[in-house]
Curated annotation (Swiss-Prot):
Organism: Xanthomonas campestris pv. campestris (strain ATCC 33913 / DSM 3586 / NCPPB 528 / LMG 568 / P 25)
A biological-process GO annotation: removal of superoxide radicals
GO cellular component terms given for this protein: cytoplasm
Sorted UniProt keywords: Manganese, Metal-binding, Oxidoreductase
Function: Destroys superoxide anion radicals which are normally produced within the cells and which are toxic to biological systems.
Protein name (record): Superoxide dismutase [Mn]
EC number(s) stated in the UniProt entry for this protein: 1.15.1.1
Classification of source organism: Bacteria, Pseudomonadati, Pseudomonadota, Gammaproteobacteria, Lysobacterales
Amino acid sequence: MAYTLPQLPYAYDALEPNIDAQTMEIHHTKHHQTYINNVNAALEGTEYADLPVEELVSKLKSLPENLQGPVRNNGGGHANHSLFWTVMSPNGGGEPKGEVAKAIDKDIGGFEKFKEAFTKAALSRFGSGWAWLSVTPDKKVVVESTANQDSPLFEGNTPILGLDVWEHAYYLKYQNRRPDYIGAFYNVVNWDEVERRYHAAIA
């Protein structure tokens, strides 16, 4: 069964003024859709076409060599963006509560230390990529970054929060001001969804 573009859980303009409607619409309907089209084309007629995309990308290193490039770039793009849309909300922002807050305190040293590390991961990623809060196989939370459309799933970690720092994610509004975009992202983080994903990752 072919992958399809997930519906956003809010309107394109819902994250204004932090992320503008034009960027959201182009990012969702053009960039994300292209990753889906390309991974569907690569997988057509293979035994992997019916796998959930997260399972597909987690198996990257065991896939046939001719599929590894398309899955890395386009399967990764689909998985990453599918998470990205859900971890933002017009009612987002603030600080995490519950178990994920406790995990951040224990493993990273508190919310301010997390913000410092996450901002650094997003700022220092040269070129295109992502910043992540992920859960390791031993159930610790870590901040990491990946290049291009690489996913923490490639290395066995489970992403629970991600920030897209490709220029297409922010350039229309922020031009080259990536720090401003990163700062705005904290205003829309959907910590309830991050908490849900944390519980799923440690289950």
